[in-house]
Amino acid sequence: MNTFKCFLSALLFLVPSAMSAHKTDPARNVIQRAIGEQHVNVSLTVRGDKGNNYFSYKVKNGKLQIQGSDNVALCRGFYDYVKSNHMGIFSWSGNNITIPTELQDQGLKKRVCPFENHYYFNVVTYGYTMPYWDWNRWEKEIDWMALHGVNMPLALVANEAISARVWSKLGLTDKEIGDYFAGPAHLPWMRMGNISNIDGPLTDTWHNQQVALQHKILKRMKELGMKPICPAFAGFVPKAIKRLYPEVSFSETTWAGAFHNWMLSPKDELFHTIGKMFIEEWEKEFG
């Protein structure tokens, strides 16, 4: 009986410790990718007390001890330690971080943020070269977000793949859908209702690749405790939808005097129908 009690006590002591270590694995992985093959003696602890986002760190007996409100805060705390001690930089142009073999002891430093959410990206950011990022590039970007304290990124990848399913269910043909979509580099302006059918169509291969990529992106963001902002129906529709709903009034928009698009009023019942379908398709795919 005494042996069993000792075993049970040891088990109860070890399980929370193991769970705590597992809980901080996403932050530890970010840190390891940032420093490459180097080693840093660091302990990570999430203390999710209610209140503002915060991180704190100190070095005691050569060990860097970081506490934070979540995994993003832990990453932000590590990067603050790196920058404050002139050990390097992690940037879009590359990273150059050199961790000393032995860390000098350092007193406690704590930072509390007055804001709950730290937003990142805008609609236009998703144009230019960003549509062509693969998972390796996205992983670096999400690491950059975590190290800089971002916890609410805009996540628009695969928007068109989902909307294509909606247009198809409504009765549009593949050609009508293809004639609506702009090419990858121009998608932000299509999403804002400025243009359509420029440098398109988007292929099924493109849609499938974007869906697979978005699964990885959202999974990593959520592992770190981020709250990605996903798209919804904004009211812009293919011109061909007038064939299906001739009784509905659509507004024609013009941009730069040369480009035209069609918009559905949010007061129209069809707006709510399409909006509901989009959310259902998105949740079916991504949860």
Please describe what each predicted stretch is.
Residues 80-81:
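Short Gly/aromatic-enriched secondary-structure transition segments
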Residues 90-94:
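Glycine/proline-rich low-complexity spacer/linker segments in large multi-domain proteins
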Residues 22-37:
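Short N-terminal segments immediately surrounding and downstream of signal-peptide cleavage
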Residues 34, 45-51, 60-72, 76, ...:
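Aromatic-lined carbohydrate-binding surfaces of glycoside hydrolases
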